[in-house]
Amino acid sequence: STPKPSSAASDVYKRQALYTELGRFMTGPYGHLVTRAIHEKHTYKEYIGVDACAVNLMRPAMYGAYHHITVLGKENEPCDHMYDVVGGLCENNDKFAIDRMLPKIDIGDIVYIHDTGAHGSAMGYNYNGKLRSAEVLLCEDGTHRLIRRAETPRDYFATLDFLPLMKPLFED
């Protein structure tokens, strides 16, 4: 006999699995990259160099992802300067923002890049010898906790086993 439509649909749903990637939904809005303006360049464009780079947040460099940027202490100032906000890698796509209207940024200003929780640190890498940054958790009561320390040069070389390669150099 032919199964009833409701019974057939029920059998199909029982065999189906649903998989989702909830990173951006669940954690995206809760991470932020805090960086400092350390360079400026005035050519045919205005560039602000920060002490973070694509190592810390690859999404804008990789596929042009938009992340809102706030210049701390200047939230109420007019966004009347157009900048490319760039990192220090030797790659032309190491940019957090292109032609972004922001308040005037001075050397030393804190540049706050929003919504980096899902794929900021998780996509990090050590290109150009850059070390991963520390991560700080801001708790609901206003306190903060270091949840991941910054990498050190020792960390960078920790998985490299080059002593066997060097042994012939020291043999007679």
Identify the residue ranges that each predicted region occupies:
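Single conserved hydrophobic/aromatic residue that forms the stacking wall/gate
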Residues: 1-9, 13
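Charged (often Lys/Glu-rich) extended helix/loop segments that serve as interaction or gating elements
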Residues: 15-172
